[in-house]
Every structure is written in C-alpha cells, then in structure tokens.
C-alpha cells in the first residue's frame, strides 16, 4: 500500500501539467524551463548532460542573481481550486537550490493577472534544503486560479505540487447537460483504494486518454483472496447515465471484470467512507473487460437515484487508464 508523505497528497494536484497548468511569466529561467515544475513524473538526474546554457536540470532554474531582488513565476493552474497543501521539491538541486520560497495566489473568473491584481499570501517564506521535499499544509479556504511562486533570491526547484479540491461554478451547468461527474476538472477526486503499487488512483480522473501504462491506476498482483477497488467522490451529486472504463495500454495486466457501487453520502471522514462502501448499492453489475480498450456501459446501469460517491471494483486486480461517470447534476 502506498504511503503518503502528507495527508493532503491524496487530493488532486491542481498544478499538474496534464490539467493544463502553465507558466504565464517568469523573471528568469535561464538554466531550466519553469514549465518543468508541473511534470507529473518525479524529477530525474541526467549525468553529464549539458545544453547551451549549462547543466541540464529537470525543473526550474534561474541564473545567479548579481543584483537586489528575487525570482518569481506567475502560474495559471489547470483547474482552479481550494489548496490543501503544497510540496516544494528540490530533488537533485544541491548547490543551486533557493534558501527559501513563498507562494501567493489569486482567483480570476476570467483573464490573467496584471499589475492591479491583488495577491493573497498562502504560504509565507519557508526555508528550503537541497535535494528534498518540503510539505506545507495550507489553511486558506478560498478558491484560487493563479499562483505566484517566489524563490529567494534565485536557484532551482524540481517540482511544485499544489494539492487541493478543484472548483467549478455548478450554477452554470444545466440540469439537462450530461457531464463527467468524476472528472478532475469537474472536482472529482479519488479518496481511497486497496492498492496503487504501479500507478496513482488519481490518474483515472485526468482528462484525455492515458499516454502510457504509467498514466493510469494499476495495482500489484493480488496473492490473497478478494479484489482491488478505488473510491471516488463526485464533483457534484448527480444521477449516472453512462460509465466508461478504459484499459488503454493495459494488455497483459488488465482486470478480468469490474463492477461499480454508488451511494449518497451525507457525512463522515474519508476513512469511514472506506468501510461504508462495502454496503453501497450496485450501480453497475459485474462486466467483463478486455485489454487496451474503452468499455461503455449505459443499458447496464441501475437507476439508483442521485449519488455523491462511487466505488469501482476490479476483479481480481490490474490496471485501468481512465474512468468516466457521465450523468446529470442533481440540485
């Protein structure tokens, strides 16, 4: 079972490049492109690799500052949301990491920040160490769409992870519109699973189809009785009309079959929901799966009314690239 370094790591990484996160402006990224901060894969070290500007580094690295000031990057998050915590990762930056960093944020319904934008400090200046992860909980309950990441005075950071709950204005979604209720961009989040040895449970909610086998959720080979499962909180309560289970790239390691349970959960913690899910109603009866394919189920869906959570069961184990739960929102 995967061990999380911080509890908030189970939330969606709002700064994931796969969600569309990008740099809008940066004071300096001479040595390494600031957009590398958002790559979903861990940073790597490439021994002896240099480019025209110096040693190739997997992250954002600015020049040595020879005047007053500090470096900063303005970031548009792929999806706006409430931030639960951040990880400032300086992996492989040893003699060139910033001594400290801070984070500011703002929310814009449209457009990009300018000189008149009011920024809110969500993480005061914190000390950094080389080749290390720095986990910090954020207690601000506002939703934010943009960040300003400050490093003092210069240097390199490998990755910036911004974990939180995606925000969507559901008042703009028609009751007649069919929408993916579990999509990360719509606020869906994976909250618990039996195992995620080879791939994160959050991957199945990402947009688009998986780029490879690592861009999905895959469990270890099960050597004990039972089956693997993942619990997902819908972005908004709704009634399910169709489910898509995609096993793209999973050929010798796809599940033999799957089923889905659902429930309208009114309270409780994530750990309590894990136990309750055993007794949820059957939304999708057991269905056979095949390798490397999208499986659509509509006629097989049971009408169980509005729900807030689903539990995807895979038998006995294996990998799933994407999960789509299509339906209409309930007010």
Curated annotation (Swiss-Prot):
Coiled-coil annotated spans: none
Keyword Translocase: no
Associated pathway: Nitrogen metabolism; (S)-allantoin degradation; (S)-ureidoglycolate from allantoate (aminidohydrolase route): step 1/1
Pfam families assigned: Allantoicase
Disulphide-bridged cysteine pairs: none
GO biological process: allantoin catabolic process; purine nucleobase metabolic process
Keywords for this protein: Hydrolase, Purine metabolism
Main EC class the enzyme belongs to: hydrolase
Reaction it catalyzes: allantoate + H2O = (S)-ureidoglycolate + urea
UniProt EC number: 3.5.3.4
UniProt-recorded Gene Ontology molecular function terms: allantoicase activity
Family of this protein: Belongs to the allantoicase family.
NCBIfam families xrefs: allantoicase
Protein name: Probable allantoicase
Origin species: Pseudomonas savastanoi pv. phaseolicola (strain 1448A / Race 6)
Encoding gene, per UniProt annotation: alc
């Amino acid at each position: 079972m995967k061990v999380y370094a911080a509890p908030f790591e189970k939330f969606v990484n709002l700064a994931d490049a796969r969600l569309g996160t990008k740099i809008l402006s940066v004071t300096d990224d001479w040595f390494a492109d600031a957009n590398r901060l958002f790559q979903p894969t861990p940073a790597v070290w490439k021994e002896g690799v240099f480019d025209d500007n110096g040693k190739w580094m997997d992250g954002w690295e600015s020049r040595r500052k020879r005047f007053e000031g500090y470096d900063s990057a303005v970031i548009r998050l792929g999806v706006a949301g409430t931030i639960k915590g951040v990880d400032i990762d300086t992996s492989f930056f040893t003699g060139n990491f910033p001594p400290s960093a801070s984070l500011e944020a703002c929310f814009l319904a449209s457009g990009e920040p300018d000189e008149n934008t009011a920024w809110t400090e969500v993480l005061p200046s914190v000390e950094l160490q080389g080749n290390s992860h720095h986990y910090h909980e954020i207690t601000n309950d506002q939703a934010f769409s943009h960040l300003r990441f400050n490093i003092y005075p210069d240097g390199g950071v490998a990755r910036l992870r911004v974990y939180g709950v995606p925000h969507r204005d559901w008042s703009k979604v028609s009751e007649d519109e069919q929408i993916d209720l579990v999509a990360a961009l719509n606020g869906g989040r994976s909250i618990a699973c039996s195992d995620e040895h080879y791939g994160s449970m959050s991957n199945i909610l990402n947009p688009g189809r998986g780029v490879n086998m690592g861009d999905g959720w895959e469990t270890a080979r099960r050597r004990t009785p039972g089956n693997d499962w993942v619990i997902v909180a819908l972005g908004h309560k709704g009634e399910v009309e169709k489910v898509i289970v995609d096993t793209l790239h999973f050929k010798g390691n796809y599940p033999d079959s799957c089923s889905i349970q659902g429930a309208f959960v009114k309270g409780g913690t994530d750990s309590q929901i894990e136990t309750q899910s055993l007794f949820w109603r059957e939304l999708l009866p057991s269905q056979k799966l095949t390798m490397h394919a999208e499986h659509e189920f509509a006629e097989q869906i049971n009408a169980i009314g509005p729900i807030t959570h689903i539990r995807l069961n895979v038998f006995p184990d294996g990998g799933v690239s994407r999960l789509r739960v299509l339906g209409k929102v309930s007010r």
